[in-house]
Amino acid sequence: FLGTINLSLCEQERDADEEERRDEPDESDVEVEKRFLPIVTNLLSGLLGK
């Protein structure tokens, strides 16, 4: 289960890295935070809630 989540996060990080190269540095940081924060929050709440 955790391996699947880690693989999924790695793929999303790679996608985010590719997008960062195309965008402005400041804008890309905000986009990564917007995309990553809900994933981490859901992961933690799922692990702590069960």
From Swiss-Prot:
The modification Leucine amide is found at residue 48. It is found in: Secreted. Keywords: Amidation, Cleavage on pair of basic residues, Secreted, Signal. It comes from the Eukaryota. It holds the Pfam family FSAP_sig_propep. One of its GO terms (cellular component) is extracellular region. Residues 1-10 form the signal peptide. Residues 11-35 form a propeptide. Residues 12-31 are annotated as: Disordered. Expressed by the skin glands. The keyword RNA-binding does not apply. Residues 14-30 have a biased composition (Acidic residues). Belongs to the frog skin active peptide (FSAP) family. Temporin subfamily. Amphipathic alpha-helical peptide with no antimicrobial activity. Does not display anti-leishmania activity. Does not show hemolytic activity (LC(50)>116 uM). The peptide is not detected in skin extracts. This is Temporin-SHb. It comes from Pelophylax saharicus.
